[in-house]
């Protein structure tokens, strides 16, 4: 993320992004990351790779929210108020070498408030314009969270690594 900071800042300003959810930040505890007019909440991995962050415009009232009980999933969460009601917003990442555990996903959902999750679970499914479905992708489609899930993964244009910000997998409950 550090090497693409100017590109990210340009994208956020050009598209008037108030809350930006990031995965695979590749930041570690000793590295500072700041953008003008933004507050950065992040979860770094102790080893190389991974990591998540949420950039929030300073004018947006919000709180950092802990997510206890995560085993393999890396996630950063905030709480904002929209239309007078609280909503939890998460950025999450799961390494391809880590197993997808239902308890990790369940820990992200708060039964008391709506949740929006944008994540990179290294999962593929044909419903998401992928040419194949993986076991993780199949699990995500039928994810047993015990709560209604609206999946917004369908992206009209082909997915490419050249446009990583067009690869979200947001879930809301």
PLM regions: where:
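A shared catalytic/ligand-binding motif for oxyanion handling
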Residues: 1-173
């Amino acid at each position: 993320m550090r090497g693409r900071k100017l590109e990210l800042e340009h994208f956020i300003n050009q598209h008037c992004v108030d809350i930006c959810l990031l995965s695979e930040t590749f930041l570690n505890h000793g590295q500072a990351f700041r953008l003008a007019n933004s507050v950065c909440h992040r979860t770094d991995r102790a080893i190389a790779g991974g990591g998540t962050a949420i950039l929030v415009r300073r004018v947006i009232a919000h709180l950092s929210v802990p997510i206890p009980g995560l085993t393999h999933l890396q996630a950063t969460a905030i709480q904002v108020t929209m239309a007078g009601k609280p909503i939890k917003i998460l950025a999450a990442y799961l390494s391809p070498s880590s197993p997808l555990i239902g308890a990790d996903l369940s820990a992200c959902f708060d039964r008391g408030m709506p949740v929006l999750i944008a994540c990179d679970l290294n999962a593929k499914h044909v419903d998401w314009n992928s040419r194949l479905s993986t076991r993780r992708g199949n699990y995500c489609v039928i994810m047993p969270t015990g709560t209604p899930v609206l999946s917004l993964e369908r992206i009209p244009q082909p997915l490419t690594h050249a446009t990583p910000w067009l690869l979200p997998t947001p879930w809301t409950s």
